[in-house]
Curated annotation (Swiss-Prot):
It is found in: Cytoplasm. The keyword 4Fe-4S applies. This is Lipoyl synthase. [4Fe-4S] cluster 2 binds at C97, C101, C104. It comes from Methylobacillus flagellatus (strain ATCC 51484 / DSM 6875 / VKM B-1610 / KT).
Amino acid sequence: MTEITERIVPPPRKVAGVKESSAEKMARIPIKIIPMPAMRKPEWIRMKVPDSARFREIKQVLRENNLHTVCEEASCPNIGECFSGGTATFMILGDICTRRCPFCDVSHGKPLPPDANEPENLGRTIAQMRLKYVVITSVDRDDLRDGGAQHFVDCIAAVRAHSPQIKVEILVPDFRGRLDRAIHILKAAPPDVMNHNLETVPRLYKEARPGSDYQNSLDLLKEFGKLHPEVPTKSGLMLGLGETDEEILDVMRDLRAHNVTMLTLGQYLQPSPHHLPVKRFVTPQRFAEFERQALAMGFTHAACGPMVRSSYHADHQAQQAGVNF
């Protein structure tokens, strides 16, 4: 468990390119998290140790091309399986986020300007890896006038130029205060799957997603879908932050009301004692029931399980949702 209390935090003085991680990152959020003994992980929470030639090869290629993956930066539990299988979710716009979400292990700080060479590096690297499906995500960039939307477009275009047959899924931030501008910019190079995660239920937004707005996230998915009805829209949630089953079902209904067609539900795992605590471990049986309920609501695809993450087996998810490749 971890004790959580509210507090007033003075604004920090930031230096561009300097990362705040773990305890330092959490020291300035409005919610104070006091580390306490963690819940014991149940037997169904199992992670593969990342140790294979393919795993090491992918890490080397990423470093040589100055690229980042959310798999590494967010300490994803599936990194060993995905890297060993030759897949990765690329994180553009640097590895420093402008927000301090206390469930997330990505570093906070004042980011450096976008790397103008990143789109070309990304396109070349993905072609070198001979990928057929790729997921591109980013940190939040509240410092940019378009939230990073143009950089997404540049990266999508470069990837397709190097790999004409590839399918591209993007996992975007909420473009806070820039939603209309970002959606307009994305028209220049729409992805094959549009993903934006709600992360948790609206009651927990102040605690888990400070600076984000539940309705804004729903609007982002709906407005993009209106402009690109041929592109599946996708969202995901973490379970175990203190939500109820009925609240999860309510969010699923909201997603369907906003024409979202793909869903992922997975177990939240605390990255460190300084992050939000796990309040419960959802059983595989309950995840299976959520999946059944999602399909009954009209989702074309639902991936629900303890180790499911938004980009986990994203290529299989897209195929089952009707994306041809």
